[in-house]
Curated annotation (Swiss-Prot):
Position of sequence motif Nuclear localization signal: 215-218
A GO BP annotation: regulation of root meristem growth
Name assigned to this protein: Two-component response regulator ARR2
NCBIfam families named among the record's database cross-references: myb_SHAQKYF
Knocked-out gene: effects: Retarded growth and development, and early flowering. Reduced responses to ethylene and cytokinin.
Regions of compositional bias (Basic and acidic residues) in chain numbering: 165-178
Compositional bias annotation for Low complexity: 554-567
Biased composition annotated in UniProt, kind: Acidic residues: 200-209
Effect caused by changing residue 655 to G: In strain: cv. Landsberg erecta
Organism: Arabidopsis thaliana
Post-translational note: Two-component system major event consists of a His-to-Asp phosphorelay between a sensor histidine kinase (HK) and a response regulator (RR). In plants, the His-to-Asp phosphorelay involves an additional intermediate named Histidine-containing phosphotransfer protein (HPt). This multistep phosphorelay consists of a His-Asp-His-Asp sequential transfer of a phosphate group between first a His and an Asp of the HK protein, followed by the transfer to a conserved His of the HPt protein and finally the transfer to an Asp in the receiver domain of the RR protein.
Region (Disordered): 1-21, 151-215, 554-589
Location of the DNA-binding region in this protein: 218-268
Amino acid sequence: MVNPGHGRGPDSGTAAGGSNSDPFPANLRVLVVDDDPTCLMILERMLMTCLYRVTKCNRAESALSLLRKNKNGFDIVISDVHMPDMDGFKLLEHVGLEMDLPVIMMSADDSKSVVLKGVTHGAVDYLIKPVRIEALKNIWQHVVRKKRNEWNVSEHSGGSIEDTGGDRDRQQQHREDADNNSSSVNEGNGRSSRKRKEEEVDDQGDDKEDSSSLKKPRVVWSVELHQQFVAAVNQLGVDKAVPKKILEMMNVPGLTRENVASHLQKYRIYLRRLGGVSQHQGNMNHSFMTGQDQSFGPLSSLNGFDLQSLAVTGQLPPQSLAQLQAAGLGRPTLAKPGMSVSPLVDQRSIFNFENPKIRFGDGHGQTMNNGNLLHGVPTGSHMRLRPGQNVQSSGMMLPVADQLPRGGPSMLPSLGQQPILSSSVSRRSDLTGALAVRNSIPETNSRVLPTTHSVFNNFPADLPRSSFPLASAPGISVPVSVSYQEEVNSSDAKGGSSAATAGFGNPSYDIFNDFPQHQQHNKNISNKLNDWDLRNMGLVFSSNQDAATATATAAFSTSEAYSSSSTQRKRRETDATVVGEHGQNLQSPSRNLYHLNHVFMDGGSVRVKSERVAETVTCPPANTLFHEQYNQEDLMSAFLKQEGIPSVDNEFEFDGYSIDNIQV
């Protein structure tokens, strides 16, 4: 039952002395529902003390009907949990569903389950009886919280609302306006921040598009630009040129340091390749080469002096000769007028103990059966020359054909060891006979050379000669002596066939193409070589006194008597003999020389010579023709039997010297 006296909020408020001017939460409308009248009276007094407007009900159904009639007549409801007609939780549900008012539950039962049930059903608070005034003073906060979330100004703007409610509504509206303003400000800030972010993203996208569209322009090195680059590099120096300085000197807009660095690297690679090609083609621009060094050939003569002949005769110490030769191995000598250039020849490969198979040409080739002259015996690496030998003579390069008719091993030297066939150009010869120099007794076999000797005049310019072009050195002529015809004629008169130095007239310049084997070939050669002047040629075979270390060396002699008289060719000594195939003995050691017409390799290296013996051609290993009728067994037997064998006439004489004395 509702207490009408207390249910009138304005009347009770006026009687209590309240006014509309009291601030919030005064005049808060409260509906109290409880079946205990004592508890109901106590609550009414405490709520009125707090300036609330109170309405009392002792039944739950009466309170629910009152709320339904006046949905907007109350601000908050306080209900007991245990009532006889309706459970307090049931009322809580109806009020919450129909009026949506805040409901406070109260009970003497403080069990946790009951409190939890009230909260779960929608109660805003749970008060334990007896209720204290301190708890009632703060019930207004639930009204504010509820109104803040669900209060609608349009629904609560009617005249039926009391003044206290109007004040409360105005205050709530002010709060909501403030909240709306703050939220609008926040929303504006959020929108502005989002706008700024979008603008930043757009700017970044534009930057990316600009960076992608603005690629580095490719530099095209035109001819003018490259010339500026080369001029800057030449001014700075190739070694000292750096991209930064080159860029400053060029001063080209749009050109970067990276472009200059890349082009400089390519330019240096080009210069290295160009320098390598020029050095490979001849080393003519080498910094260690002078104008006088740009010729070919070993250091065999210096300013017209025959150093090796001077060393043999004792006028030049062997140590000095060795030093000069060692210094000259890698340095070409100066070419004299009227002389042909000859490539550097390795003097260590004079003898090679292998079986060469050398082609002589046109099906008449003669090869030696045994090229191993001294089987198992090491030979010296340098050949000594006799006094009077013209070492630095006119020579020409005649490459030997490398075809092997019978599949024998090739004895052709390498590129640096090409054989040189040269003829003497010296017209002077003060020696009328051969002088054999024995290495073991140099003081007895050497003599002082006169100043008019051919050693001191190796390069005459007044020699009448005929010339012919060379295949390997175009434009270089080789003077030859007329005395070669005498050698050919004397060989024909003796009955032998001269099989050497022929073939110079062949257009192919093959040294072995025109070597004859029969007498009719010699006549043809005589007709071809009428105007040739080949002089000062000879062959010296020498053997050591010790048979175990014997060796054969080819040397050059300058005597004109080698090609004149047969009596001079018959001179011999009786130290040791070498038995030939026809019963003739080759004497070794010997002080006399049997001089034969031959062509030798310049600088004391390999010689190629021809002999007057019929059908024989001699050469040392590595492209020199050996006497075919004297095989290895004959020579070895001769060297081993040199002791105790009497002197026998022969056409070949050998002068021996120790291999150990050969200068390297």
